[in-house]
């Protein structure tokens, strides 16, 4: 996100993650609450979910724009809600056809606009 910069990107990502927690909920099957980290990436991935530690990783600098940043937050948060350790890796098909990936992509489409609208309405500095 060359144009936006680190501080605003990290701030928006934290707001998106809080929105996800409030609106999408948390996985009650986990022994501990989910956490998230917004950090600089080291390859081309925009985000990741670690099911063992129940941690969402957002690589802010790998996202092209605010839309992709928010989509990544929603996508990875969706994985936090899914049975990743027990079912995700048992799917024999390709990554793109995995039903858990498909659900995460559907949630990106479904919730990105709503999340971004909420962030802009509650943070006037964004629209300046």
Language-model features: where?
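Acidic/histidine-rich, surface-exposed loop or edge segments in extracytoplasmic proteins
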Residues: 1-4
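Zn2+-dependent metallopeptidase catalytic core
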Residues: 7-30
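Hydrophobic (often cysteine-bearing) scaffold residues that line and stabilize catalytic clefts
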Residues: 9-13, 66, 70, 96, ...
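Surface-exposed helix-capping loop/turn segments at secondary-structure junctions
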Residues: 22-31, 86-87, 115-122
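Catalytic zinc-binding patch centered on the HExxH motif and its immediate surroundings
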Residues: 35-57, 64-67
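Short pre-active-site segment immediately N-terminal to the catalytic Zn-binding motif
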Residues: 56-73, 94-96
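Catalytic Zn2+-binding segment of zinc metalloproteases
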Residues: 77-94
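Post-HExxH zinc-binding segment in Zn-dependent metallohydrolases
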Residues: 92-124
């Amino acid at each position: 996100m060359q144009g936006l910069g680190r501080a605003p990107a990290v701030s928006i990502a934290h707001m998106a993650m809080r929105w996800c927690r409030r609106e999408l909920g948390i996985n009650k099957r986990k022994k501990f609450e989910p956490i998230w980290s917004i950090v600089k990436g080291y390859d081309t991935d925009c985000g990741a979910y670690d099911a063992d530690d129940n941690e969402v990783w957002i690589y802010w600098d790998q996202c092209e724009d605010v839309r992709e940043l928010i989509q990544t937050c929603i996508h990875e948060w969706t994985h936090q809600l899914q049975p990743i350790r027990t079912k995700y890796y048992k799917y024999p098909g390709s990554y793109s056809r995995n039903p858990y990936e498909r659900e995460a992509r559907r949630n990106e489409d479904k919730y990105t606009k709503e999340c971004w609208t909420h962030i802009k309405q509650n943070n006037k500095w964004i629209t300046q």
